[in-house]
Amino acid sequence: ALNTSLGLGEIDAVRATIDEDEIGDFLPHVRSIIAYNAESKVVETMRMNGVLISQIAPNGGIISGSSSVVQLDAWNWEDAVISYDQGIHLNWPSPYSRSGYSYYRGPSVIKKSEKYESNIEEIKNFFDSSKAYLNEPNPNPVSLPYKAMSSVFSGRSTVFLHANYEKQIKDGVKFLQEQKIKNIVVVGGTNSLQ
């Protein structure tokens, strides 16, 4: 099972058991493997149905954090891990916004997002700030989000680009190539051919 929050949440009604979505927009330093619960009832159910390996990925924000690959037959996260922090998850903003269905207005309407360009600029600023931070010989104060980007810029980590529309995919891949990111994987792409 790829790109799943399996083992990061147990009971949806109890916020304290949900570790898949942290607060904040740029969280490349958040490691999903640390929160992985190998003894989750959901993990046991998946294993009984033949799923033996899974990529545990965080959700939410613009950069959600790093994912790891685990085997589902383990006592704890240290035993479960196959590949640590293999990449970060970048949720590319949608170029479209949707108005909700209303009894008075009728069905929802899809239109161009007014915030699309400013959201992309925010991502660009984060990448530029990360590079500037990493080029400092002794950065002070320490910034964990910027520091976590070093493996992305060096090519040791993959960027999992979450995008569904054709424009999102093209813009996201173009941006990452301009940033000289070597390892890019598109996640989703459900509306890419429309």
Q: Across the structure, where does each feature detected by a protein language model lie?
A:
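Short internal beta-strands
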Residues: 185-189
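Catalytic core of soluble alpha/beta enzymes
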Residues: 170, 190-194
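Short, glycine/acidic-rich beta->alpha junctions
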Residues: 34-38, 62, 190-191
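Polyanionic/metal-chelating signatures
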Residues: 42, 47-183
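Short gly/pro/ser/thr-enriched loop/turn and capping motifs at secondary-structure boundaries
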Residues: 6-8, 61-64, 192-193
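Metal-associated gating/positioning segment near the N- to mid-region
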Residues: 1-49, 54-57
